[in-house]
């Protein structure tokens, strides 16, 4: 199976400019292609992973990737299917975010070895050297306002208002493709389906300005089986940066994917062969309660993003927390596993009697409730049940002299911080 047909089989081809021509190009030799990443945050997230992994699949098939960091376009903001205009960031912020994105991309693409090693480019390099007058004369003249207004991404903003800054974004992205086509013989652009209008602006500019060959392929914006936009946990983005979304949190995210989505996501987010995925599907449908598809997803993606050590750590945290074995984990692991639970910073003057502390730290609302919970065996300190109403937190309860973990009932965790 050629690479284009495999991408289709995996559900990774949403739209192309000319499917037959693109398939033929990918079959006949090495194609140089690019994907753009605007630094709109200090990390990429799961939503970016579809295009990143598609880029990696093409590289493994012998094609040459160019990763474009939008140092210039990141200063403008893409209006595509956004309800309101993005906040403009400072140059310093965009440069900082761009550097972090470079580091993350190197985890997925091969930049060091091989004839088709990836190349990193920044569109600030060419936009900073072109004057506004030259841009209007040499680029703007190829775009009619009617053409620009016809883009769905613009149409949706006309009623609420769109600034000229954002309106011009599609020309800038189109010029990126032209620059890469002219200087690096890049003939394919890959991006999310919401980018179609901006991407075809590039093929139009290449056709009109140089009569060059160019293709566009979009990957789908992933939604779950309920139609909900994929890549968020509790309304928050799942980031590729371990400091923003820990490996444990990412592991839990994949572990909790719905049955109806699990096999489809294996095709999109892992490098398991289609035959391996089909075998998993059969086993999964025979025993869905064992959650083989979700466990495989969690293993493959966390290992891919954070490495095998982080994956094993996430599994261990999951198992120990499920068993209530707090002392089986390091403070570092506990902070991963309990990120997001209520925290209380203990002051030196605080009364460390269990009843007073439960109220002060917000575990319970009243001393009466605290006494009731302790008497009934509902309170655990570092995994040990406490039923002594006079119990006082001691140095022995401070894990690594830093935290104490309180559990109320089976699942409600609270962390006391002593630093």
Curated annotation (Swiss-Prot):
This is Tyrosine--tRNA ligase. Residues 352-419 form the S4 RNA-binding domain. ATP binds at residue 232. GO terms for biological process: tyrosyl-tRNA aminoacylation. Coiled coil: none annotated. Gene3D superfamilies: HUPs, RNA-binding S4 domain, Tyrosyl-Transfer RNA Synthetase. It is found in: Cytoplasm. Catalyzes the attachment of tyrosine to tRNA(Tyr) in a two-step reaction: tyrosine is first activated by ATP to form Tyr-AMP and then transferred to the acceptor end of tRNA(Tyr). A motif ('KMSKS' region) lies at residues 229-233. L-tyrosine binds at residues 34, 169, 173. A motif ('HIGH' region) lies at residues 39-48. Belongs to the class-I aminoacyl-tRNA synthetase family. TyrS type 1 subfamily. It catalyses: tRNA(Tyr) + L-tyrosine + ATP = L-tyrosyl-tRNA(Tyr) + AMP + diphosphate + H(+). One of its GO terms (molecular function) is tyrosine-tRNA ligase activity. PANTHER family: TYROSINE--TRNA LIGASE, MITOCHONDRIAL, TYROSYL-TRNA SYNTHETASE. It comes from Streptococcus agalactiae serotype V (strain ATCC BAA-611 / 2603 V/R).
